[in-house]
Amino acid sequence: MEAAEAFYVGGGQPPRFQVFERAAPVELRALLKRRGYREDARMDVQTAPLTGLAGRAAAEWVIEEAPIPGDRWWSIYSTVEHGSIRPAEGTDVETAFRGTLLRPSDPTIFVTASRDGVTAAAGQGVAQGEWLGVQCLATLPKHRRLGAARTLMAALGHLGQDRR
């Protein structure tokens, strides 16, 4: 956490954390509170039946799934989320981000969408009983509005149904 804080402060940005309750390590909320962080915004949660998601794929996208975030997944997500202050590969900050994503207590799947050999979008699904939490959904700007995120959601819907 110290490395992440130093990284953002060094880049002139305030460190902030988004916590998805069921996918976060159980000790994270208490650690953030001890370090002086406070909750300042809540997020909306949208729900849909998994069956409604599963049929919305765009055929031209190739979906790959993995139990951990691979290099292409990480590249898409960190580029969209961190842009010009993206953590350098192999740094403590990058390792911390990867470690956080790898630690949910529920079954997790990571997906990427590629077209014409170019990986353009990434997402994460966390199976929670009858629920599938979707987070870290990211599409590179020049590939937006082409069906990549919709196809990722469809793939995650199928995977969520399979994991029930």
Regions of interest found by a model, annotated:
Residues 20, 130-141:
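Conserved acetyl-CoA binding element of GNAT-fold acetyltransferases
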Residues 33, 96-99, 153-155:
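A generic local structural motif
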Residues 12-13, 162-164:
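Short, high-confidence coil segments that cap the C-terminus of an alpha-helix
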Residues 7-8, 101-104, 159-160:
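Hydrophobic helix-cap positions at the C-terminus of alpha-helices
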Residues 59-132:
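Flexible, substrate/cofactor-facing loop regions flanked by secondary structure
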Residues 1-5, 136-141, 145-162:
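Conserved acetyl-CoA-binding loop-helix of GNAT-fold acetyltransferases
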Residues 50-53, 116-117, 142:
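Short loop segments at secondary-structure junctions
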Residues 2-72, 82-85:
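Acyl-donor-binding surface of acyltransferase catalytic domains
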